[in-house]
């Protein structure tokens, strides 16, 4: 199957590129997967785009895939020929078993919430209730590439314009479906391998920083299990009233803050935002490269008597080293590697832009405490140049709201004040951020610098907005906590292993329980919730007709479609479910007003003018439909345009 060949060659290329990484076989596999996806995805996209838009060729993805496979094979062959040293596994059975079990679990969860099944002779794609809403734009984008040639790329829920959403991960999934993988395998495989690869590298970062493999395992465990007091509340209530059946069968996400009922802070985020795991995989490679540069802080010799005197001496030494020394502002001999890191982060911008922002913030924190700050500047400048190029290529500033940085204090706190933010963080994460402050005070200097760096995305989330919906800033806080977990894991291991005694072991158990119990309960909630799923008939007459008759240049007026047989055809909707396009920066209000007019007006001339002016080529009408609670009718539409498809209550009219 072409898709399997594509994946194998992609991995082989990435794996060979990682030869110089200071990790064992598992680390190389993980990094190789990420680099392979990044390179192969861009080659296919660029060649396919050029083939269709510039050369006007049909079947552009054929040329894109041939070019991608050929280039990746060439890179792999040249690297193998250049360096024939034998590969060392350098791993343990326990470590290998841990990674294998981890992969099986992640892959199972991906399929649990999104899979194809057969019911009553129909092939249905099932999406769990916790993810189907976010999957509406994801699957529509995937299908716009697998069933159509979405070049220049448009946003399917707001067609006829540009694309303001980082779509490249969906493009990769769409390309794999085009090459023969069923959509659930295409999306789930790259999602599972990307997230698994990130967690493998997170394990190695934690192991490298702390010196404990156990800290790596705990860090990965904490990734799945967030901190909050909410589950303790549920446990206390169950103990009080004895309703344990309700406790174990709960299907609603719990918490005390706005939108926690969305599953905004738990593993569900990675089940519905599949590209986030991939973005973090590339970010982890960048962080692994730079994090060693903070170790010098632990070698400072501080003189003086008394705590204050020693603190003053240490601050003066650090300040002189990071500001006044010659090495602080020079470029290192490994600046070329820093440039490659910049290329990777820049290439990531339209795979996951939020991860790029968070990573640059973290690297800025590293740079503050490091020598050779120009290396960081090289990485940042290349990243920003590539991001600027892509943003101007994909996004039309005249359409909707362009990306902008605005000051917005408080995030989702009830009171937009500093006390309100502190209260919000305690309600959201329990003891977590109190623990971060304590760890920053008591841990060694290099750890203090790392914590300072990893906390910067949290500060960004509470002060800056780049989109119309401030809630999307939750990703910055999630990213920060994922890396901050390393230091909690270190503290837990030290309490358990290095300080002998039952008391410290009890403290370790209590600490990890408080930090993970709500996240563990969230996993149960996901399991319970996604027993219920939204099913879409993949072979419906409507999907088939739309797939075969609608082109990517057509613009189709529908109801407020989220995930449906219409969106699974991969067509460009005039105004799909408005939240998706609105949160990406599109003017959904104007289009909604136009749609209400077209479906509800009795004025033929008004409808004709609107349809022509907006470039709408097809109108889909379903008996009994409403638009923003306004009644709709096709009484006038059928007088103006020919009905080209009818199936039950659904009719499609062609306007040109």
Model-derived segments and spans:
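Hydrophobic, aromatic-rich transmembrane alpha-helices
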Residues: 285-295, 358-368, 427-448, 494
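Membrane-interface helix-loop-helix junctions at transmembrane boundaries of multi-pass membrane enzymes
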Residues: 91-95, 296-336, 370-378, 436-455, ...
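Active-site lumenal/periplasmic loops and adjacent helix-entry segments of GT-C-fold
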Residues: 93-95, 105-282, 532
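Extracytoplasmic
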Residues: 496-656
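Hydrophobic/aromatic-rich transmembrane helices and adjacent perimembrane loops
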Residues: 195, 276, 357-363, 470-495
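Membrane-interface alpha helices of multi-pass inner-membrane proteins
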Residues: 267-272, 324-330, 337-353
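Membrane-embedded, hydrophobic transmembrane alpha-helices
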Residues: 1-93
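Hydrophobic alpha-helical membrane-interfacial segments at the cytosolic entry of transmembrane helices
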Residues: 95-105, 218-220, 372-394, 437, ...
